[in-house]
Amino acid sequence: MASLTTALPNKAVVAHFMMGLTYNYAQSDFQNDIQNAISLGLDGFVLNFGNDSWMMSKLTLMYNAADALNLQFLLYLNLDMSEMSTVPASTLVTYVQTFANRGHQARINNNVVVGTFLGQDINFGQSSVNQGWQVAFKNALASAGINIFFMPTWPLDASTIYQTYPVADGFCKWNCWPYYTSSPTSDAEDLVYIQNSKATNKKYMATVSPIFYTHFTSKNYSFFSEGLWFTRWMQLIKDQPNYVQVLTWNDYGESTYIGPTNYAADFPVIGSNSHEWVDSFTHAPLSYSLPLFIQMYKQNTTGLPSNFSGISQLYVTYRVHSKNATASSDSIPRPDNYQNSSDVISVISFAKSSYTLRVSVNGTVLGTTNVNAGVQSANVSFIVNNTAAAGLPLFQILNGTTVIAQGYGPLNILGNNSVVLYNFNFCTTRISW
């Protein structure tokens, strides 16, 4: 067995982990998360955290969990500066010092990896943002014997960010959703990041996410997510950034979770409770595509990767009501940007040979499409006569006219007059043959 390493490998794929939801977690919860992540081909977790009084104890449990498992899996801290904008740099330095020499702490060029969420406007009393992070943070850590690889997530101009902020050794770009548009997400900004990271001999971490939807009183919007998982992965496979971060492992409040739902989590409540759009809406079946997409990225291929087992797979995602339906009992309005969603069932296919896919609800055929061998995607509308086709979707795999496999979706699609609460999250299933 190969010895464990703390070096974050080239083309590592890591997942964003929301430590703020782990107040009730035991070490066993973290161990389960790590084991599940390893089974999906992930190389590590990016531990996003704020300044909660209990946070250090939970971060310690996460690192302890990695030690106890003694498996190849890396961790690094991600300072959530949206929560810690007034925290002194000396406190942030202490956080990094606490875990810098742990056995599963990720390193690049033997330097401790540290990220942020925001922080691009904080100077810690220095003359500039660059000087602030350099003097009060990086230099302070270096004086304590800890050299870091600083890779913040700062939403700034990709064409100048590397040149303007040399304090960073690399950057992560957060935005991977189509913001307030019905057009598919673009990789134009990624290409600028990649070009400039190479020009400055630095690194770039791109991001991928399955969906975005949140439905709180003060935060109520969705982004066009139909087909996003496939589209974004295929972009990153083509573009080949240094690293990829999956957004997210466990953010239930924003529906971006790709890991199995852990009900020990402290589900966010802001007027409404995120249990309303997460319970029964597991994304785990979609997560089973992760090992395949990760291997495609690492092997730089848009065809079937080497870890494809030969068993064909159809991954299905869909919302349970039309974007135009009116909820009868929701105290919160329909989410902002709802109109840019698409009333379709999205599928991703990893198949050894071509086939025909037929999708129906209660005997009404919604669509029939020919799917080629390899890695493909398709969308089928669930609207019939200007309303959602109510019932449980049936997915049939046909060879000619012979059904060779079939499966139902996990949840009924609701008719336009049957929606009680809005939910723009999607449910998922997988069919194998």
Curated annotation (Swiss-Prot):
One of its GO terms (biological process) is ascospore release from ascus. Disruption phenotype: Abolishes ascospore release from ascus during sporulation. Keywords: Cell cycle, Cell division, Glycosidase, Hydrolase. GO terms for cellular component: ascus epiplasm; cytosol; mating projection actin fusion focus; nucleus. Pfam families: Glyco_hydro_71 (PF03659). Its EC number is 3.2.1.59. Promotes the release of ascospores from asci by hydrolyzing 1,3-alpha-glucan in the ascus wall. It comes from the Eukaryota. It is an enzyme of class 3 (hydrolase). GO terms for molecular function: glucan endo-1,3-alpha-glucosidase activity. It catalyses: Endohydrolysis of (1->3)-alpha-D-glucosidic linkages in isolichenin, pseudonigeran and nigeran. It is found in: Ascus epiplasm. Belongs to the glycosyl hydrolase 71 family. This is Ascus wall endo-1,3-alpha-glucanase.
